[in-house]
Regions:
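Alpha-helix-loop-beta-strand connector modules within alpha/beta enzyme cores
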Residues: 16, 63-91, 140-147, 199-207, ...
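Mid-to-C-terminal alpha-helical segments outside catalytic/metal-binding sites
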Residues: 259-283
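Active-site beta->alpha loop and helix N-cap motifs at the rims of alpha/beta catalytic domains
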Residues: 35, 40, 65-132
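Catalytic alpha/beta core domains of metabolic enzymes, predominantly
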Residues: 116-238, 251
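Short beta-strand segments at enzyme active-site cores
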Residues: 50-60, 87-91, 155
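N-terminal small/glycine-rich loop or linker at the start of catalytic domains
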Residues: 4-30, 118-125
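Conserved, mostly hydrophobic/aromatic
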Residues: 38, 45, 56, 117, ...
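Glycine-rich, proline-tolerant flexible connector loops at the mouths of alpha/beta enzymes
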Residues: 26, 51-74, 126, 183-184, ...
Length: 283
């Protein structure tokens, strides 16, 4: 089968990012913050159809936290509510840069051990601040994931990060199948345009399983371009709290997942089952 037709055939992943570090109750009443709220949203999304969930932890006051104990409560609640869905924990450097803090959730074990963990491949600026990711911190997180048997889910905001994925592959820190989220629409990163999506996808390591994500008002545009290019979709209130560009209607996580399924239907695609991605990760 020609490469393009092959890329447009079969199931694609849907990654739910329900919470993030930025949305607050003051911004939207729909963002899930507690373990039970997150689990409820994941279960509702799983009933519609998702492949994996990308988790951020909040403390009792709704403030982002790196603490393993909080992640344990969230992961436990999600495992119970949606046992098939693959779980990804964040190692973000947006609020803290210390390797020990960022890696704390990677020590979860048993049924709480995450399937995947995020790995941002360079430092970057958001409109309100920086996410600092020094090369040795990235390598340190990758080594811990490799030792723990946790698959890195690469977070890529620009073409330099794509190149660094190849560097880590050559160094043996990404020995297995590559899983990546490509982010478009950030003020200091790739934009949601055809040329930038195409170039980023073209330069990914061979055989990568990738999803497209759009920040803020670019969520639907980036998702549409990703599906048209043969990729999956990342969706959720972490990336944008509004359902429409006019910002007249606040979204919920299930609403956003339902819209992705309508998008897939138009392109004659289906959501990848969790077990299909699970098998792909261990090929």
């Amino acid at each position: 089968m020609p490469a393009l037709l092959s890329a447009l055939d079969g199931a694609v992943p849907i990654v739910l990012a329900p919470t993030g570090m930025v949305p607050t109750r003051a911004m939207t009443p729909h963002v899930p913050l507690t373990p039970d709220e997150i689990a409820t949203d994941v279960a509702a999304a799983a009933a519609i159809g998702i492949t994996s969930v990308h988790l951020h932890a909040r403390d009792a006051d709704g403030v982002p936290t790196w603490e393993r104990e909080v992640y344990a409560r969230i992961v436990g609640a999600v495992r119970e509510a949606a046992p098939d869905v693959l779980i990804n924990v964040s190692t973000s450097g947006r609020t803290w840069s210390e390797l020990e803090k960022r890696a704390d959730a990677l020590a979860l074990d048993g049924d709480l051990k995450p399937d995947l963990a995020s790995l941002t491949l360079s430092s970057l600026n958001f409109i309100g601040g920086a996410s600092v990711n020094e090369p040795e911190t990235i390598r340190g997180l990758a080594r811990i994931m490799l030792d723990r048997g946790i698959v890195p889910e690469l977070e890529i905001f620009d073409l330099g990060m794509v190149n660094f994925a190849h560097v880590l592959k050559k160094e043996g820190l990404l020995p297995g199948p590559v899983v990546a989220n490509l982010f478009f629409g950030n003020v200091a990163g790739m934009q949601a345009t055809l040329p930038e999506v195409g170039l980023a996808v073209e330069r990914l390591p061979d055989g990568a399983t990738w999803s497209g994500a759009g920040l803020g008002d670019f969520q639907l545009t980036a998702q549409s371009l990703a599906v048209a290019a043969g990729g999956g979709v990342r969706v959720g209130l972490e990336d944008g709290i509004w359902f429409d560009r006019a910002r007249t209607r606040l979204a919920t996580n299930p609403m956003l997942v339902e819209r992705v399924h309508r998008l897939l239907d138009v392109h004659d695609r289906v959501a990848m089952k969790p077990d299909e991605l699970r098998a792909r990760l261990h090929e």
